[in-house]
């Protein structure tokens, strides 16, 4: 499995050059100290339609499906994930984002999170293609635009962005809409 750094991209194609039509992006994390409860929420923003799929509306975007909300990050493997079915999606780019739920009132930030990473899979074969660490330099930020799934004429390219933000889901979505 490839380990991506900020700014690196991965073409989502099969060895024969055809497009991977179904991908999954998983998010895993641990809390920095025992007894803490930090709820990270994975959500997807479709820039062109200005739609957001998140824990209260998991199917807001055609072709996108979100997993159930993991409130603690406990356990092995991916804590939350999103699936993209390219045969059902609209044209345009999809942004994979994460925020800390209710961070402002809970006085929480990414400095309370360890080992957070995003992993992209070929969901047709359940094969991990690449991972990207997202907890470096999180500091007092409460959200991050993790990656972009760029539509490149019938297939997608995954780009690790790592853009930290202080904001909730709405504020992060507004940043994406302005891109």
Curated annotation (Swiss-Prot):
InterPro entries: Stress/Tellurium_Resist (IPR051324), TerD (IPR003325)
Pfam families xrefs: TerD
Similarity section: Belongs to the CAPAB/TerDEXZ family.
Protein name: Uncharacterized protein slr1764
């Amino acid at each position: 499995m490839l380990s991506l750094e900020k700014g690196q991209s991965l073409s989502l194609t099969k060895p024969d050059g055809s497009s991977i039509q179904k991908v999954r992006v998983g998010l895993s994390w641990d809390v920095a100290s025992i007894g803490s409860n930090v709820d990270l929420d994975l959500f997807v923003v479709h820039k062109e339609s200005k739609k957001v799929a998140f824990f209260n509306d998991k199917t807001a975007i055609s072709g996108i499906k979100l997993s159930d909300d993991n409130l603690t990050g406990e356990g092995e493997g991916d804590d939350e994930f999103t699936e993209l079915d390219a045969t059902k999606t609209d044209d345009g780019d999809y942004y994979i984002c994460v925020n800390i739920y209710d961070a402002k009132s809970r006085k929480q930030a990414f400095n309370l999170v360890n080992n957070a990473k995003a992993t992209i899979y070929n969901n047709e074969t359940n094969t991990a293609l690449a991972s990207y660490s997202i907890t470096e330099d999180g500091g007092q930020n409460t959200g991050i635009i993790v990656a972009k799934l760029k539509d490149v004429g019938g297939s997608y390219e995954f780009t690790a962005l790592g853009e930290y933000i202080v904001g909730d889901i709405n504020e992060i979505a507004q940043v994406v809409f302005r891109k």
